């Protein structure tokens, strides 16, 4: 009986040892398998993104408007004036790597966000590549913070990153703002408006936004009824940067595979990019609009933007009297975007100058961002090519010419000019006109007024005097050619 009990006890011990040994082996195999999966997933992401075939310039190329045919010139009579509409085809080519940030895309353009470099990205309406992420380091360039300028975001979603940025800014405001000042970083761009594609490329902003916020009448611009310039003032308070990965897989959780990324849109035509930095500050968009037909409108608007005293000089008084100015502000202490419409440009200047310093009451606003390709950390740049029509309208008024002969001799006058119009193809048509009194003798004192239509050009005046000399009976004393009205 004792031997039986001993054998039974030994058997139980052996079974227990076998069970423990089997469990240990199973756990070790599970751990090893998990490690292999992590390595395999990371390798699949790095290899998959590395093997994507695309050209950085071509994948983000934007071919805008194409202008095939147009009438180069036409003329109309309006309110006693002759109006010439001059139409020219221009081509604009720009490469932009800094994208203006709008409300509608703020939750897709935060530091560290992963996007798809496709047509939506080129249109500044990027799509997010949503997948589980690893922790991400972000840093801010506010002065004086040293090692406190960086924070780790455990789960870098839009909300978590925005909160981390707020923490960094709050730290600066509480500890360093009193002893450190921000350098002034104001960027300024301006352009005349000719078409949606042209102004979007020129100012690097979505045309729909400009259309909605500034109410640009593109049809009136195209018809020559209005002339519009838009200026963008961008003041950067600080920039937040996301740490660039050594490998694409450094951004994604160990459970993420390349297959998951491709299911969510990654392809040769939509390679992944990461928002590497976001600039925070404020932007002021200014629209200068006029119904003036003067050829000096662009010069007048440029002078107004750069010279505080140009209004008082009177040089462009007529243009400014027919103009209105609109300003839209993004950022600063306004809870909503301010919009001001005025005829007094000093109000616009005050808006630009006000709220120019970062503080608790005057927070920064995300205004622009830069993205980099995950494949090689190259900067993502959109390459815009677009044709656009530049329309210039010129008004001509009627005029009068006074002939006054008071010399003690017989005189003759020859006066002629060309009336010009344009046919349906924009080709100029000249009709030669001659004053009815041309070539007739006039004795002193003779005076008359010759009306000149508003579409007169190539005005010629010849005056002759009768000398009484047989060898030179008539002598030319005035000859004016190629005078343009």
From Swiss-Prot:
GO biological process entries: killing of cells of another organism
Ranges that cross the membrane: 196-209, 216-225, 294-303, 311-323
Motif (Conserved undecapeptide): 465-475
Purpose of the protein: A cholesterol-dependent toxin with hemolytic activity against host red blood cells. Causes cytolysis by forming pores in cholesterol containing host membranes. binding to target membranes, the protein undergoes a major conformation change, leading to its insertion in the host membrane and formation of an oligomeric pore complex. Cholesterol is required for binding to host membranes, membrane insertion and pore formation; cholesterol binding is mediated by a Thr-Leu pair in the C-terminus. Can be reversibly inactivated by oxidation.
Entry keyword Membrane: yes
Family under the similarity heading: Belongs to the cholesterol-dependent cytolysin family.
Keywords, in A-Z order: Cytolysis, Hemolysis, Host cell membrane, Host membrane, Lipid-binding, Membrane, Secreted, Signal, Toxin, Transmembrane, Transmembrane beta strand, Virulence
Topology within the bilayer: Multi-pass membrane protein
Protein's cellular compartments: Secreted; Host cell membrane
Claim: Metal-binding is one of the keywords in the record: no
Primary location group: secreted
Single Gene Ontology MF annotation: toxin activity
A cellular-component GO term for this protein: host cell plasma membrane
Assembly behavior: Homooligomeric pore complex of 35 to 50 subunits; when inserted in the host membrane.
Signal peptide: 1-28
Record-given protein name: Hemolysin
């Amino acid at each position: 009986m004792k031997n039986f009990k001993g054998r039974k006890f030994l058997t139980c011990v052996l079974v227990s040892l076998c069970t423990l040994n089997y469990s240990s082996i199973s756990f070790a195999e599970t751990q090893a398998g998990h490690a292999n999966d992590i390595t395999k997933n990371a390798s699949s992401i790095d290899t998959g993104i590395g093997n994507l075939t695309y050209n950085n310039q071509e994948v983000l190329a934007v071919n805008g408007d194409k202008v095939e045919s147009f009438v180069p010139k036409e003329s109309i009579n309006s309110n006693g004036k002759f109006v010439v509409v001059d139409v020219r085809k221009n081509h604009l080519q720009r490469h932009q790597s800094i994208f203006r940030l709008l409300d509608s895309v703020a939750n897709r353009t935060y530091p560290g966000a992963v996007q798809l470099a496709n047509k939506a990205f080129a249109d500044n309406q990027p799509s997010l590549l949503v997948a589980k992420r690893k922790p991400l380091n972000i840093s801010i360039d506010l002065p004086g913070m040293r090692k406190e300028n960086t924070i780790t975001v455990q789960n870098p979603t839009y909300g978590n990153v925005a909160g981390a940025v707020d923490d960094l800014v709050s730290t600066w405001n509480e500890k360093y703002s009193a002893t450190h000042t921000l350098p002034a970083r104001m960027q300024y761009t301006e352009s005349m408006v000719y078409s949606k594609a042209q102004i979007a490329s020129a100012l690097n902003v979505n045309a729909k936004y400009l259309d909605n916020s500034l109410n640009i009448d593109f049809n009136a611009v195209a018809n020559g009824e209005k002339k519009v310039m838009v200026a963008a003032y961008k003041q950067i308070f600080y920039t937040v940067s996301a740490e660039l990965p050594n490998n694409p897989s450094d951004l994604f959780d160990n459970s993420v595979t390349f297959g998951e990324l491709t299911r969510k849109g990654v392809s040769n035509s939509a390679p992944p990019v990461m928002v590497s930095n976001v600039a925070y500050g404020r932007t002021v968009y200014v629209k200068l609009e006029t119904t003036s037909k003067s050829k000096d409108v662009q010069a007048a608007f440029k002078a107004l933007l750069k010279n505080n005293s140009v209004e008082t000089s009177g040089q462009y008084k007529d243009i400014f009297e027919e103009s209105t100015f609109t300003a839209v502000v993004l950022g600063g202490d306004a809870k909503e975007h301010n919009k001001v419409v005025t005829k007094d440009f000093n109000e616009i200047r005050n808006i630009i100058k006000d709220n120019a310093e970062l503080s608790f009451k005057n927070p920064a606003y995300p205004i622009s961002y830069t993205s980099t390709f995950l494949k090689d950390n190259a900067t993502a740049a959109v390459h815009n090519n677009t044709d656009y029509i530049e329309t210039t309208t010129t008004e001509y008024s009627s005029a009068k010419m006074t002939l006054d002969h008071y010399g003690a001799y017989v005189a003759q006058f020859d006066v002629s000019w060309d009336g010009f119009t344009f046919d349906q193809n924009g080709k100029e048509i000249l009709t030669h006109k001659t004053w009815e009194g041309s070539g007739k003798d006039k004795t002193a004192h003779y005076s008359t007024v010759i009306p000149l239509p508003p579409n007169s050009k190539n005005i010629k005046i010849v005056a002759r005097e009768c000398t009484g000399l047989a060898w030179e009976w008539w002598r030319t004393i005035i000859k004016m050619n190629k005078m343009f009205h």
